[in-house]
Amino acid sequence: MTIMRKSHPLFKIVNHAFIDLPTPPNISGLWNFGSLLGMCLILQILTGLFLAMHYTSDTLTAFSSVTHICRDVNYGWLIRYMHANGASLFFICLYIHIARGIYYGSYLYKETWNVGILLLFLTMATAFVGYVLPWGQMSFWGATVITNLLSAIPYVGQDLVEWIWGGFSVDKATLTRFFAFHFILPFIIAALAMVHLLFLHETGSNNPLGIVSDYDKIPFHPYYTVKDFLGVILLLLMFLTLVLFFPDKLGDPDNYMPANPLNTPPHIKPEWYFLFAYAILRSIPNKLGGVIALVLSILILALLPYLHTSNQRSMTFRPLSQSLFWVLISDLFLLTWIGGQPVEPPFIIIGQLASILYFLIILILMPIAGLIENKLLKW
């Protein structure tokens, strides 16, 4: 008699995905972040569901309802702070996951990579509309500034902005539809994550050496279930430390003031995880140019499979590419810092140089480094 997990139509799917899945024996802790992202998504959906039970998406009561959650609902403060800081945790895992994909050449699995880019865009959209919901000062002005960027699109721009706003400014209609988007998008993300996994299991996982490991595989369970569980424990430990001791560390103090269309905050900026893109947007003194640069800063990831010139997949044995990779990471940290600074010298020129370097490394320097390394291998 066959084991139930191998014969039952439903359990069979789970078995092939998480139990008997053949996995390379040498994948490092950096491969944990896929499962950690799954954990983050579940955490966000659950906490978000409980918040939605008490939240009201009306401009007059939204801010008060969030205050009510924190003050009057049982453990409401905990749920609210877990949800708010859970977004930061999500993006930390997301950025490490992408960085690992770039470092080890995982982008050569084109379908998996492209679905991943779509997931990134959807996650960014979800985080953006979610940030508007508390209806604080930064929520309101962030929504106004970012949605207004669409007006840079020739011919249809202004109509598009008014269509998204549901009127002639960010108001009740905008808040209601943003709440609807924020509720539905995570479920679309969950469905796409399944597609992401489906494409990954078609090819099998990559590994740190970037070589074919078909002849040497081990089952996912118990080896990697235990390893993933360790990652979950460590991440939850750090997460709960942040939530319980420093809940407002990553937030903006301006968002504790109710939205006021007549009073602009001194410095409008998004959450920390969007600052690098915001710095790239601001580095071009032209509205349309800035919007194009902003979109390209993420969309450029789709070009990576076509810009891969090296004979080796992974950067493990490629010192030139490694150096450029770490310069790119440093550049992103620099852009994140610049995004949080006011638009004044010397920050303007630093932001412009960092933005140029970002595109230069990905589009020109990394492919050249790959070609040089190919030559060095022949010597």
UniProtKB/Swiss-Prot annotation:
The keyword Mitochondrion applies. GO terms for cellular component: mitochondrial inner membrane; respiratory chain complex III. GO terms for biological process: mitochondrial electron transport, ubiquinol to cytochrome c. One of its GO terms (molecular function) is metal ion binding. Binds 2 heme b groups non-covalently. Heme b b566 binds at residues 97, 196. It is found in: Mitochondrion inner membrane. Heme 1 (or BL or b562) is low-potential and absorbs at about 562 nm, and heme 2 (or BH or b566) is high-potential and absorbs at about 566 nm. The chain crosses the membrane at residues 33-53, 77-98, 113-133, 178-198, 226-246, 288-308, 320-340, 347-367. The cytochrome bc1 complex contains 11 subunits: 3 respiratory subunits (MT-CYB, CYC1 and UQCRFS1), 2 core proteins (UQCRC1 and UQCRC2) and 6 low-molecular weight proteins (UQCRH/QCR6, UQCRB/QCR7, UQCRQ/QCR8, UQCR10/QCR9, UQCR11/QCR10 and a cleavage product of UQCRFS1). This cytochrome bc1 complex then forms a dimer. Keywords: Electron transport, Heme, Iron, Membrane, Metal-binding, Mitochondrion, Mitochondrion inner membrane, Respiratory chain, Transmembrane, Transmembrane helix, Transport, Ubiquinone. InterPro entries: Cyt_b/b6_C, Cyt_b/b6_C_sf, Cyt_b/b6_N, Cytb/b6-like_sf, Cytochrome_b, Cytochrome_b_C_euk/bac, Cytochrome_b_N_euk/bac, Di-haem_cyt_TM. Belongs to the cytochrome b family. The keyword Repeat does not apply. This is Cytochrome b. A ubiquinone binds at residue 201. Heme b b562 binds at residues 83, 182. It holds the Pfam family Cytochrom_B_C. Component of the ubiquinol-cytochrome c reductase complex (complex III or cytochrome b-c1 complex) that is part of the mitochondrial respiratory chain. The b-c1 complex mediates electron transfer from ubiquinol to cytochrome c. Contributes to the generation of a proton gradient across the mitochondrial membrane that is then used for ATP synthesis. Its cofactor is heme b. It is a multi-pass membrane protein. It comes from the Eukaryota. PROSITE patterns: CYTB_CTER, CYTB_NTER. Coiled coil: none annotated.
